[in-house]
Structures are given as C-alpha cells and as structure tokens.
C-alpha cells in the first residue's frame, strides 16, 4: 500500500512520512516535545548504578577521541530511561561534548548527566530521547550563557557569536521514521566540526551552520533547533 505522491531528485517521497518535517513548524515540534517532557515518568531505579559501573568501559575510546564521545552505537551497556544510550542518548552526548569543548574538563560525569536528564528532559521514557529545550535549560542551570533559535535564517549569526553549539535536526527531511538526531558543533580557526554523527565525523570541516545543513546526511537532514553556547 503506497503513500507516495511525488519525487525529490529521483527519490519517491511519502506524504505521510514527510508530513511532520515538511509541514509542521519547528516551534510546534518544540512545543510537542515540551508537552511530552512535562508528562514524563522520572523514576528509573538502577540506571545510575549501572551507568556508573559501565561507563569505565568507554573511557579509553573517549581518550582516543580527544575527550569527546563519538561512537554512540557502542553505548549499549548504558541506559537512559527504559532505552539504551545507543538508541536515544544523542542529546546528552551532545551536551557532554559541548561542555567538555568549552571547559576542557569532565567535571560533570556522563552517568550523572544522564541521571539529571532523567529527572527533567526525558521524553517517553527515552523512546523520543530528550526535549531540545531541556538541553538549553540544563546548560543555563549549570551556569552557561546561551542563545537559541528555531529559525534557519538566524543560525549563521548564532554560529558566529557562539563558542560551541548544539543542533537538533531531522535525519531525513522526507521521512520522520528516520528519527531526530542532535549533534555538538565545535569551532576552530573559523571552521565548524560536528561530533557523534558517524565514523570520524569530527575530521571534516564546515564553514557555517548553513554549510552543515547543506551537506550533513548528504543534504537530506532538516533543522529543528540550534543552541549557541558562549564561554563564561
């Protein structure tokens, strides 16, 4: 039973699958996440203990990646709500990476950060990850100055004014079933680098947030929300 009614560059596009990324505004998407955030269940006994025990399995890899978490798919032994970090932890990973980029330290442990988002930010017990605005609230609560927008035309200015960024996007602007992903963007010598978006994604330079959106996931991604973070 097909639901395709047009093509994009030779690709069949399903009206049903593309409806949310194509037709629903970013602000409405953020509002939906906020509603689910407020309705969230917050009691996940045992997760912090298991995560503290298992995080040591990843320390060598983090060291090899210059202090960043890059290989989310390896985190099948750490939990966020009722899911694993490998399934739904990208927002927390992006936050962890951004704070490390800004401070050069891991003062907040990754398991403790997961625990904090389980108390405020988790959506559908982890099935939908973390509400994007909860990331900004977390950063503010930990003393970071932020600027944010869901309007693409404002992104490059935010990129220029920020020291690190966190971008939430649809993996596929034509297929909501390919889910949402959140990445940390770091800056060096007026170039932008993305973290935790596939094998050694941090090695490829970009030249603006617009450039990232044009090229990431072969141009198939679509923005939802950008947070810029400014060093204290």
Mark where each language-model region is.
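Mid-length scaffold segments of soluble, non-membrane domains
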Residues: 119-148
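Hydrophobic residues in alpha-helical segments
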Residues: 117, 156-159, 216
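Active-site-adjacent structural segments surrounding the nucleophilic cysteine of cysteine proteases
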Residues: 1-124
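Active-site-adjacent substructure of cysteine-protease-like catalytic cores
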Residues: 148-192
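Noncatalytic regulatory segments and standalone regulatory/sensor domains
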Residues: 186-232
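A structural signal for well-ordered alpha-helical scaffolds and beta->alpha junctions
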Residues: 92, 128-132, 220
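A glycine-rich, coil/turn loop motif that links secondary-structure elements
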Residues: 85, 125-129, 155
């Amino acid at each position: 039973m097909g639901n395709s009614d047009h093509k994009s560059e030779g690709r069949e596009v399903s009206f049903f699958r593309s409806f949310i990324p194509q037709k629903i505004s970013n602000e409405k998407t953020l509002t939906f996440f906020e509603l689910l955030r407020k309705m969230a269940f917050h009691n996940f006994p045992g997760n912090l203990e298991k995560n503290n025990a298992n995080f040591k399995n990843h320390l060598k890899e983090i060291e090899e990646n210059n202090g960043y978490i890059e290989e989310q798919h390896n985190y099948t032994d750490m939990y966020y709500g009722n899911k694993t970090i490998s399934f739904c932890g990208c927002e927390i990973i992006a936050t962890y990476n951004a704070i490390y980029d800004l401070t050069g330290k891991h003062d907040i442990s990754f398991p403790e950060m997961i625990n904090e988002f389980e108390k405020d930010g988790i959506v559908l017990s982890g099935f939908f990850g973390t509400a994007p605005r909860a990331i900004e609230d977390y950063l503010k609560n930990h003393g970071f100055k932020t600027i944010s927008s869901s309007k693409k035309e404002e992104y490059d200015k935010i990129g220029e004014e920020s020291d690190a960024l966190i971008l939430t996007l649809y993996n596929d602007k034509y297929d909501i079933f390919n889910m949402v992903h959140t990445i940390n963007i770091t800056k060096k010598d007026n170039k932008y680098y993305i973290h935790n978006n596939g094998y050694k994604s941090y090695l490829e330079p970009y030249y603006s947030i617009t450039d990232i959106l044009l090229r990431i996931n072969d141009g198939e991604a679509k923005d939802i929300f950008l947070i810029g973070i400014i060093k204290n």
